[in-house]
């Protein structure tokens, strides 16, 4: 995505530079289209960069949330020094649950930071808020089950109902985790769509300008 955006910015610069055929005196970061419209390349570049940076930050949060699916595979396991890598160790999942809990706290903190970014659309802020709400719901549910989850000897069954989204019970956090997964998927799509929208707006203006270059 970043390479694509850099290439687009360079293309825009070259095309708009070819449009600078007189007109008002321009600043170093401005170009003029043939119809006299002055374009600020610095603002254009920043708009693309801001959208790209936001999408990249959302992707980081998305990766953290999805990592819990991998962590859940360690329920009832311990490392083994052979090609099998793991062996069973039932009902000792306290540290694993604490680790997942910390991941979601980190997710919540990152979402709070994303909410405070100036310039993102109200739609994206709403999407961020929805993901944050689901992360808080998971934290609240896990805390409410502290009798079963806030100890070293968390049983495999209880651990699964907390962090395994395919578990049949899902009464200790897994149900909230499913909602969080759905919400972060939707936010990532919205963030990527925002980048594509900015790119389409700018490339459309370039395509509209190109025919005049042959006049």
From Swiss-Prot:
Membrane topology qualifier = Lipid-anchor
Lipid anchor (S-diacylglycerol cysteine) at which residues? Answer: 19
Record keywords? Cell outer membrane, Lipoprotein, Membrane, Palmitate, Plasmid, Signal
Q: Which GO terms describe its cellular component?
A: cell outer membrane
Which coarse location class applies to the principal site listed for this UniProt protein? membrane
Q: Does the keyword Signal apply?
A: yes
Q: Where in the cell is it found?
A: Cell outer membrane
Q: Quote additional remarks.
A: Genes for both Vlp and Vsp families are on (usually) unnamed linear plasmids in B.hermsii HS1.
Q: What is this protein called?
A: Variable small protein 3
Species of provenance: Borrelia hermsii
């Amino acid at each position: 995505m970043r390479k694509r955006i850099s290439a687009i910015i360079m293309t825009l610069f070259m095309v708009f530079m070819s449009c600078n055929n007189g007109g008002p005196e321009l600043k170093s970061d401005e170009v003029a289209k043939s119809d006299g419209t002055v374009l600020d390349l610095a603002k254009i570049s920043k708009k693309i960069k801001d959208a790209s940076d936001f999408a990249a930050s959302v992707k980081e949060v998305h990766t953290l949330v999805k990592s819990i699916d991998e962590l859940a595979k360690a329920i009832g396991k311990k490392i083994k020094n052979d090609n099998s890598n793991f062996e069973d160790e039932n009902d000792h999942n306290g540290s694993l649950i604490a680790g997942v809990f910390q991941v979601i706290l980190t997710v919540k903190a990152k979402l709070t930071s994303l909410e405070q970014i100036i310039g993102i659309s109200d739609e994206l802020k709403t999407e961020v808020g929805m993901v944050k709400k689901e992360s808080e719901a998971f934290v609240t549910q896990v805390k409410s089950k502290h009798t079963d989850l806030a100890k070293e000897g968390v049983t495999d069954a209880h651990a699964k109902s907390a962090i395994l989204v395919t578990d049949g019970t899902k009464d200790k956090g897994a149900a909230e985790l499913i909602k969080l997964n759905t919400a972060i998927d939707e936010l990532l799509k919205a963030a990527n769509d925002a980048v594509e929208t900015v790119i389409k707006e700018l490339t459309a203006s370039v395509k509209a300008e190109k025919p005049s270059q042959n006049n």
